[in-house]
Structure formats: structure tokens, C-alpha cells
Amino acid sequence: CTSEPYQAPGTKRMAQRLAQLVDGINPEENIYLSAHRVAWLRKRPPAKSAVLKLSQQIELAKELLQAGESAAAADLFQTVRGQAGANRLRTRPSLEEMLALSYLRLGEQKNCLDNHNLASCLLPIEAAGVHKDQAGSRSAIHFYSEVLRKSPFDLTSRWLLNIAYMTLGEYPHKVPEQWLIPPAAFAADYEIGRFTDRAPDLGLDALGLAGGSIMEDFDNDGLQDIIASSWGLSDPLRYFHNQGDGRFAEYTSKAGLTGIVGGLNVNQADYDNDGFVDVLVLRGGWFGADGLHPNSLLRNQGDGTFADITEESGLLSLHPTQTAAWADYDNDGHLDLFIGNESSPQQNHPCELFRNNGDGTFTDIAAATGLDVIGFIKGVAWGDIDNDRLPDLYISRLGEANLLFHNDGPGPNGQWHFTDIT
């Protein structure tokens, strides 16, 4: 028999904590978890009136489409379309638009995913990127043409109609002239050549949602490895080790990372100065009230494994975020950590500045330094703007002015402070 790979106690605790988050999902409130919402909507009792029943079916069809069940979505939209006229039901987007999108997505799934190749879904689509299974795009063309006959200035539908023809190898010569987007529109000011997707050849063609990725030599063997996250709550963090022969092998389990899931972003830093680069996983971004997720600080043990030390390091907090940046703001030789959290009118989630205590632990001093910023933070970056050898901080906020904070250094009492000089 084979023994399970070693996993640090902190990693086991974090894996349990993350599993509990999945168990506590509320699909009624969280609009991003479409697969869970599909299951919830299917259990909902049907409305009494015919119009409300159709509205329920449309809502379910939209969630099916967002959950990747494009064929089921198209079938349900077709059913509703057959009944909508008699009930004088109008929708925005129209049922024809939703049908067109469902079939276009179905074509992508049947070809770009199920029969993926190096030219799949790369614009302009040509040669090997042309769909072999053409049913989805044929149906999409039918419905986009119907939409454009009614709304000839619908630029979104016009664009997607051209894409549908492109997937069939029939662009531009078969696109109706009045809806053609000419090839010149795709021309670049500078020809830089065509990039080649090497992921399948290298063992890196992993599926996932939005997420982050970092390339770093995690085991100091002189070769760059890759760690990638995926936003889905049950999606694993994946560690791809560079084999040195032009390929990567997945070492996620071997590295003790089983159960470390989710994460809209990741970044890296050697926070403890031991010569091995560590990893920070950021979670909860865009989830709003459902985004009270812990981040993960994964300490590189130097033996090919990582340990989740979030709790023991003092970094455990529950806020939605996707952005953070490391810098030694006080020049003590230890990297500190700023985390930009996402506040909303319903909930405040102040930003955090964790001072590295130099003993493997951190202390949040954001309030004391003037960096407990409120906003929907989407990006943060350190940089010395005035050459005083002290890192200053730039913060990007969604829907509000961005902020620039000057590092004032320590005051008379030794307390460091930042001033908003935006």
C-alpha cells in the first residue's frame, strides 16, 4: 500500500475551514455560484401564473448557461420561446439573443474544450481553429441574423455573428455585407507575429476559472516552476514542477497542498528570508457578503512541501480580497504585507497592513499607520516615489478615486505613518 503524502497540521486545518465554506454556500444570495444556483432553482416550487412560470424557466435557463450547461440552456430557451408569444412575454436580452449565445457557447465547448488544439479560440480564428462540430455556430448564426433583422444597430450581436462565421471558416466571404466587420478591423498597427500556446505540450493545459499564477523556482534547482489558483470554491491550487526536460509534472499532492482550494489571485515572496520563496493565496474577491474567506500563507519548507501557516503567523482574517503586495516598508530587513480588501455599502472591510515581526508572525498595524482604507480595492503596488528609500503605496479602487500614500517614516514616538497625498 502507499501512504498519503505528508500534510502539515496548519494545512489540514485550512483545508477543513475551506471545505466548511463550500458547505455553507447560500446560492440564493451568491450570484456567482451558478452550478449551485441551478440546483437551488430546480427545487423551487413553480409559480401559479403562466407568466411567472415562464419567468422562472428563463431564470433557470440563464443560470444553466452561466454554469456551462449550454445545451440544456438552449433547449429550455427554445421551450420558453414557444410559449412566450402566447403570453406576451418580452425579455431583455431577448430570447433570440440568449439562444444565439447558448449555441455559440455550445460550439465553443464542443470544439475549443472537448477537441482543443493550439489554434482553438485564438482571434482571428483560422485553419486548425475552425470548428469541426459546426452545429452550435450554425444555430448561433441563425438566431443572431434574426436579432439583427429586428435590431440592425445591435453591435454586440453583429460582432458575435462575425465570430460565429469565423469559427466555421466562412469569414469574411459568407458574412452578409450589411453585417460584415471587415478584416481590416482586425489589423494591428504593428505586426508582432503569432504566439503559440505551448501549454498542452508542457503538461500545463489545466482547466479553471479566473485565478492567479506565479512562475518561480520554488525548490532552488535552477528551473522555474508554476503555481496556479482558480476562483471556484472547490477548485484546487495546483503546483506544476519543472522537470527540466521541457515538461511540467503536477506536484500538488506531493507538496502537501491537497485541500487548499479557491483563490482569485496568488503572489510570492520569501517572507522569512530562508532562501525559499513562499506563496500567498488571496480569496473572497467579488463575492461580497459571501466573501468572508481566509487567505492562505503557504510557507515553503525547503523540502518540496508547503505548510499553511496562516493562523499561527497572525494573518488569519475574513475579508473579500484579490490583491496584496509585499514590501519592507520600515527597512528592518523583513518583508511586510499590505492587503487591499473589498468594502461595499453594506459591509466595511478595511485594508490591512501586516508588519513582519521577524519571528514568523505578523501584526496588523493598518489603523495606526493610516492605511485602514475603505473601498472596493482592486489593485495595490509599492514604490519609492521620492527616492527617500521608503516604499510608498498606490491603491486602485473600483468606482472611486485611486489613492497615493506617502511613507512618512517613524514619528517622534517611533510609530510609522502614511499620508494620503493623492
Q: What residue ranges belong to the model's regions?
A:
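Short coil/linker segments at helix-helix boundaries
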Residues: 24, 79-93, 101-146, 170-191
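Structural register within alpha-helical repeat arrays
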Residues: 53, 60, 99, 106, ...
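Beta-propeller blade termini
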Residues: 202, 211-220, 241, 255, ...
